[in-house]
Structures are given as structure tokens and as C-alpha cells.
From Swiss-Prot:
Organism field: Coccidioides immitis (strain RS)
Function: Required for the assembly of the mitochondrial respiratory chain complex IV (CIV), also known as cytochrome c oxidase. May participate in merging the COX1 and COX2 assembly lines.
Family note: Belongs to the COX16 family.
Annotated Gene Ontology cellular component terms: mitochondrial inner membrane
Protein name as it appears in the record: Cytochrome c oxidase assembly protein COX16, mitochondrial
PANTHER family hit by this protein: CYTOCHROME C OXIDASE ASSEMBLY PROTEIN COX16 HOMOLOG, MITOCHONDRIAL, MITOCHONDRIAL OUTER MEMBRANE PROTEIN 25
Membrane topology (UniProt): Single-pass membrane protein
Transmembrane segments: 35-55
Entry keywords, A to Z: Membrane, Mitochondrion, Mitochondrion inner membrane, Transit peptide, Transmembrane, Transmembrane helix
InterPro entries (alphabetical): Cyt_c_Oxase_assmbl_COX16
Disulfide-bonded cysteines: none
Gene Ontology BP annotations: mitochondrial cytochrome c oxidase assembly
Span of the transit peptide along the chain: 1-11
Main location: mitochondrion
Length: 137
């Protein structure tokens, strides 16, 4: 029986192999010898470059969002509590009874601190007929 050769078979570069094939073969051959240089370094540089490219894009996104959101002054906030026209003719603009008149933060703080939060009673909400009320007994 003949003995097999220990040399690897390397096909000759024929006219049929393209430049891309030859570059790919060389890349794969050198990849096992220098993995970080040929794979890791290009990957890391691509990530860093992508970060620098995408930074202005994200800044533009947030600037566009900030243009949409506008800060409302206290007078405008009070004006938002007014109801629109009802159509009755007399006073087309009526005050919303649920509108909360905003004062200073100190006034609100002292108003909340003055409430007696220790004396309270839990009351059940009245249910419609036929609606389960959640009681187990």
C-alpha cells in the first residue's frame, strides 16, 4: 500500500479563481495565526466608529423631541383649567369646577401638613345591582 503524503494539497491558482476567492483564502489562512488583528480589531474599530457616527443622529432625535415639548408658564397652566364655549350665548367661557388653583409650593406643603391623616375611615363604594362587590361572605 502506498503511503500518503504529509504535505497539504494546495490547489494552484487557476484562471478560474477570482481575486475575491484568493483574498478569502489568504484571510482564512492568516486568521488562525492572528485572530485579534484580523477579526477583533476591525470589529472594535467598527463599533467605535459607529458610536461616533450615531451620536449626532441621536442628538438630532432628542432636539426634535424637545422642540415638540414646550414649557408652560404658570399663567398658561391656570388658563388650561378653563372650559371652552358651551354655546349658551351668555358667557361662552366658563370656569371648570374641577380646576385646581395652583398656589405656591409652600402653601401646598403647609395645607397638606395641616390635614389629619391619622383619623380616617374606610368607606366602601356603592355597587350597581348585580355587580359583585368583592366580599367573600
Amino acid at each position: 500500500m502506498p503511503v500518503f503524503q504529509t504535505k497539504r494539497f494546495r490547489p494552484s491558482t487557476s484562471a478560474g479563481s477570482t481575486l475575491g476567492d484568493r483574498i478569502g483564502q489568504m484571510y482564512r489562512a492568516h486568521l488562525s495565526k492572528h485572530p485579534f488583528l484580523l477579526f477583533g480589531l476591525p470589529f472594535l474599530s467598527l463599533m467605535v466608529a459607529g458610536s461616533f457616527v450615531l451620536t449626532p443622529a441621536t442628538a438630532l432625535r432628542y432636539e426634535r423631541h424637545d422642540r415638540k415639548v414646550q414649557q408652560v408658564s404658570q399663567q398658561e397652566a391656570l388658563a388650561l383649567g378653563i372650559k371652552g364655549p358651551d354655546g349658551d350665548g351668555e358667557n361662552d367661557i366658563k370656569m371648570n369646577p374641577r380646576r385646581r388653583v395652583l398656589g405656591s409650593e409652600k402653601e401646598e406643603y403647609y395645607r397638606l401638613m395641616a390635614k389629619d391623616l391619622d383619623n380616617w375611615e374606610q368607606k366602601r363604594v356603592q355597587r350597581w345591582k348585580g355587580e359583585p362587590d368583592g366580599r367573600l361572605s
